[in-house]
């Protein structure tokens, strides 16, 4: 297995995005693109990527705008860009996959999957709507969907905050809209990220990294809420390729997915939109970061076996919706 790092230009036209690829020996059994979550970076998935590469799956991912080593020239962390920059981040996912398919020499018939975690799962769901039929299957980890009324309230509140403080600012409201009362079920709290993982070592490593954590900007939360509104729209969901399989994975104690209830809402919405192959699994005892919990090897294996079982879907990638 070989790991390479390089950069490519974001759709914002100015930011070089850090990209990583984990390359097994050819022929590849499949390929997987990773879309990471809020306040983290793609190398947090190194152990998972090496596991898959050891089984013949090529893995590639990049740091989203304002994350990891993909901070724009103006130096603002956890900021995608001005209003509408959600579009850039979704475009980057599509463009990077096209680039990777060429770089890695992925042959026609080799299935290409997309995995999105947390914020990355919201971006992946936007990608499914905007670029239907371009991946063979999607894995959504730590996803959810706030009720429409709560989302509308959040959008109105963050618009006022942006006008008052500026989109590059941080505020208590923006942080509350990002993380809500996630830590409340886990009182007494050891850290502000107890909701993220039952694995204390994982949280401590996260907190010690200068590339992880931090308060999201008002502008990023504005873009995230806009994206959530898009992916919660029944009309938009009907644009997805209904033949491409989707796997929803979450910890039973993940507050982002409303302890499983929000994940089930997403599953129902997909089925109502006509998706033919939607599966869901909840892991007892696990919180938000199922790929970093103590029993993560079971999650790794489930993802690999699911991809293996859907390898025959490669012919559907260019299929109609």
Regions found by a protein language model. Name each.
Residues 271-321:
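Catalytic active-site module of serine/aspartate enzymes centered on a nucleophile-bearing elbow/loop
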Residues 124-211:
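Alpha/beta-hydrolase-fold enzymes
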């Amino acid at each position: 297995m070989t790991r390479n790092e390089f950069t490519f230009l974001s759709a914002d036209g100015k930011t070089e995005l850090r990209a990583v690829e984990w390359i097994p020996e050819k022929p590849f059994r499949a390929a997987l693109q990773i879309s990471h979550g809020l306040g983290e970076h793609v190398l947090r998935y190194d152990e998972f990527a090496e596991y898959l590469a050891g089984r013949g799956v090529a893995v590639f991912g990049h740091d989203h705008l304002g994350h990891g080593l993909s901070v724009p020239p103006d130096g603002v962390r956890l900021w995608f860009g001005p209003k509408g920059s959600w579009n850039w981040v979704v475009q980057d996912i599509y463009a990077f996959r096209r680039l990777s398919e060429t770089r890695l020499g992925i042959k026609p018939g080799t299935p290409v999957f997309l995995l999105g975690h947390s914020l990355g799962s919201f971006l992946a769901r936007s990608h499914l709507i905007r670029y239907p039929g371009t991946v063979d299957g999607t894995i959504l980890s730590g996803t959810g969907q706030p009720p429409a009324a709560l989302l509308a309230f959040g959008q109105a509140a963050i618009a006022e905050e942006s006008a008052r403080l500026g989109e590059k600012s941080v505020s208590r409201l923006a942080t509350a809209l990002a993380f809500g009362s996630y830590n409340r079920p886990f009182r007494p709290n050891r850290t502000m990220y107890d909701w993220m993982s039952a694995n204390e070592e994982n949280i401590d490593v996260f907190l010690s990294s200068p590339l992880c954590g931090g308060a999201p900007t008002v502008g990023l939360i504005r873009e995230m809420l806009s994206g959530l509104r898009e992916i919660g729209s029944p009309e938009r969901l009907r644009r997805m390729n209904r033949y491409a399989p989707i796997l929803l994975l979450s910890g039973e104690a993940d507050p982002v997915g409303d302890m499983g209830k929000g994940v089930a809402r997403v599953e129902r919405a997909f089925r109502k939109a006509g998706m033919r192959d939607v599966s869901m699994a909840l892991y007892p005892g696990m919180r938000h970061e199922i790929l970093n919990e103590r029993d993560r090897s079971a999650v790794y294996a489930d993802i690999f076996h699911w991809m293996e079982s859907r390898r025959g879907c490669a012919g559907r990638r260019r299929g109609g919706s």
